A protein has these predicted regions:
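Long, hydrophobic alpha-helical segments
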Residues: 57-80
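Hydrophobic/aromatic residues in alpha-helical transmembrane segments
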Residues: 67-74, 122, 155-156, 185, ...
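Start (N-cap) of specific transmembrane helices in multi-pass transporter permeases
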Residues: 10, 14, 99-112, 116
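A structural motif at transmembrane helix-loop-helix junctions in multipass membrane proteins
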Residues: 147-181, 185-195
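Helix-loop-helix units of permease transmembrane domains in multi-pass membrane transporters
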Residues: 77-109
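Terminal transmembrane helical anchor/hairpin motif
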Residues: 38, 42-45, 183-259, 263-266
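Secretory targeting signals
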Residues: 34-39, 44, 48-63, 107-168
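Aromatic- and glycine-rich beta-strand/loop motifs that create alpha-glucan
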Residues: 1-25
Length: 275
């Protein structure tokens, strides 16, 4: 455990010195600042106002930006260490493969989760100072969604980094996966299935297997428990499960998916030629 924590600390320290972390923090901190400057909390759209509307807009933007940030900054974790021989150097010490691998994941999780979480905390604190009503249920749900989103894409990134030896190839695969989850499943695949008159329930089930789609739906579930803004899609979701069950599912499913990918990545990592 001591070695694992040491690897996590070293990865965290390295990330904090990297330019990408500064940009990453500024993006999400800047989003919150921009929303306040633009007067988002002072306006009302579709019944959403105050901090509730700000958090809704923040999570909707984060759903798009956070996955690609996690993927492109993490897929080079192992492949990059292999390229510059850091991996070979680290394993020359009495450190096991599992300690190295899970230490890297732990350190990177803290690095990518902390800025998005602290940006939300800053919004809540600023709102409290201004005397705004704090939507605690929405805040806690979004913290859970951010945790699940970080876990799922971190697992995917480490699986890619374990399989691919080249950092450039890893970046290309990461970008393709992001585009695939963001657009292809929603637009191309579903359009083809609708043209072939596939059952609507099957189409929606495939769409909800996409973690990014899960986050989109869960993000509005507290504002709109009946999911009326989604139209007929809401009937399939709410017929299959209650709103509370769906919220729990939207957090547990991506988290377990990320853990599964991380375990698969570890199995690949320990069986491959490390150098």
């Amino acid at each position: 455990m001591k070695n694992l924590m040491l690897i996590a600390y070293l990865d965290l320290k390295e990330s904090l010195r990297a330019k990408w972390f500064l940009i990453y923090s500024l993006v999400f901190g800047g989003l919150i600042a921009l929303f306040f400057i633009a007067g988002i909390t002072e306006s009302q759209v579709m019944g959403f106002s105050g901090l509730s509307r700000l958090l809704l807009m923040y999570i909707q933007v984060t759903i798009v930006i956070l996955p690609i940030f996690i993927l492109i900054t993490t897929v080079r974790s192992i492949s990059g260490d292999r390229d510059n021989h850091t991996l070979e150097y680290m394993l020359s010490f009495p450190i096991s493969l599992s300690q190295y691998y899970w230490g890297k994941i732990s350190g990177r999780f803290i690095t990518v989760f902390l800025p998005v979480f602290l940006a939300m905390v800053a919004a809540i604190l600023y709102g409290a100072i201004k005397g705004a009503e704090i939507p605690w249920s929405i805040f806690l749900l979004y913290v859970g969604l951010l945790f699940a989103m970080t876990s799922s894409f971190l697992g995917i990134a480490f699986l890619i980094s374990s399989i691919v030896r080249s950092s450039e190839m890893a970046l290309g695969i990461a970008f393709f996966i992001w585009i695939f989850l963001l657009a292809f499943i929603d637009i191309a695949l579903i359009s083809i299935m609708m043209q072939n008159r596939v059952n609507d329930g099957v189409i929606i089930s495939i769409a909800l297997a996409n973690p990014m789609e899960i986050f989109r739906v869960a993000a509005i579930s507290l504002f709109d428990p009946e999911l009326t803004v989604m139209g007929p899609v809401a009937f399939y979701i709410l017929d299959a499960m209650s709103q509370l069950t769906f919220v729990i599912f939207s957090i547990l499913y991506p988290t377990l998916l990320g853990l599964l990918f991380a375990i698969l990545g570890y199995n690949v990592f320990r069986k491959k030629d490390l150098v």
